[in-house]
C-alpha cells in the first residue's frame, strides 16, 4: 500500500463514507447492477457470523440512495459544466462516481457546505486517480458551485431538467471506458483500499472495497444454499 493511502487514516468518518460511496458506485457501474442492491448485499454479508465486509455506514447509504434517485438530473448538470475537452461518458468511471457523489452533496444535502463537498471530492480523486483527474474534477465542481442556487432550484423540477436537456448532452455511462482515449490516470489505477491496514484500529469507519463479480457471486450463492 502506498504512503498516500496510509495518510487516508487521518480523515473523519464522513470522508470515509464518501470514499465507500465512490467504491460502490464504481462497482455498480462496472458490474451493471443497481448500487442500492449492492448496499442491501453488504448489509446481509455484514450480519454474518464471520462477516467478510464491514457494515455500510448510514451516510454512505444516504449518498447511494440519493445518487440513485437523482442520477439523471445529476448527469445533466455535470454534462453542462464539465470541461469542454471531455464528456461525462468518456471519463474514467471512478471519476464519474466521485463527481456524482460531490454534486449530489452540493445540490441535495444542505448540511454539507459546498466547499467541503468540493475539497473532499478533489482529495478522493487524488487518492484514486491522480493530479490530472483532481484538476478537472475541481474545475467542474467549481463551475457548478458558482451556480449552485440555480441548480438547486432546477433540481426541484427534475422532469423539466430532463425535458430541457439537449440531445447533445452525454448521458453517462454511454459505453465502457475506451482505453485509447484514457487519461494518464485511468481506471487501471483505481484499487481497493486494504481494509485491514486502513481501518484495523477503528470500529465505526467504513471499509473501502470493490468486490469482484466472482467473489460476491460465490458468497451470495453459498448463503442461498445454506438458507
Swiss-Prot record:
One of its GO terms (molecular function) is RNA binding. InterPro entries: NusB-like_sf, NusB_fam, NusB_RsmB_TIM44. GO terms for cellular component: cytosol. Coiled coil: none annotated. Keywords: RNA-binding, Transcription, Transcription antitermination, Transcription regulation. It comes from the Bacteria. Residues 178-189, 201-214 have a biased composition (Acidic residues). Residues 165-189, 201-227 are annotated as: Disordered. GO terms for biological process: DNA-templated transcription termination; transcription antitermination. HAMAP family: NusB. This is Transcription antitermination protein NusB. It comes from Corynebacterium glutamicum (strain ATCC 13032 / DSM 20300 / JCM 1318 / BCRC 11384 / CCUG 27702 / LMG 3730 / NBRC 12168 / NCIMB 10025 / NRRL B-2784 / 534).
Amino acid at each position: 500500500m502506498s504512503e498516500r493511502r496510509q495518510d487516508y487514516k487521518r480523515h473523519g468518518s464522513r470522508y470515509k463514507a464518501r470514499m465507500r460511496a465512490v467504491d460502490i458506485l464504481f462497482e455498480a457501474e462496472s458490474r451493471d447492477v443497481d448500487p442500492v442492491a449492492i448496499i442491501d448485499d453488504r448489509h446481509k454479508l455484514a450480519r454474518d457470523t464471520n462477516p467478510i465486509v464491514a457494515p455500510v455506514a448510514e451516510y454512505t447509504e444516504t449518498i447511494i440512495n440519493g445518487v440513485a434517485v437523482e442520477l439523471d438530473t445529476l448527469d445533466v448538470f455535470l454534462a453542462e459544466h464539465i470541461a469542454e475537452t471531455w464528456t461525462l461518458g468518456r471519463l474514467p468511471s471512478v471519476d464519474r462516481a466521485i463527481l456524482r457523489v460531490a454534486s449530489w452533496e452540493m445540490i441535495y444535502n444542505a448540511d454539507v457546505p459546498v466547499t467541503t463537498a468540493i475539497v473532499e471530492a478533489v482529495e478522493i480523486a487524488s487518492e484514486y486517480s491522480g493530479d490530472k483527474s483532481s484538476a478537472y474534477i475541481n474545475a467542474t465542481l467549481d463551475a457548478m458551485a458558482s451556480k449552485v442556487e440555480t441548480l438547486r432550484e432546477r433540481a426541484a423540477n427534475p422532469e423539466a431538467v430532463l425535458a430541457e436537456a439537449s440531445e447533445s448532452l452525454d448521458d453517462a455511462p454511454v459505453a465502457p471506458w475506451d482505453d485509447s482515449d484514457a487519461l494518464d490516470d485511468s481506471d487501471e489505477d483505481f484499487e481497493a483500499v486494504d481494509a485491514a491496514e486502513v481501518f484495523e484500529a477503528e470500529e465505526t469507519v467504513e471499509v473501502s472495497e470493490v468486490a469482484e463479480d466472482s467473489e460476491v457471486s460465490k458468497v451470495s450463492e453459498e448463503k442461498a444454499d445454506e438458507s
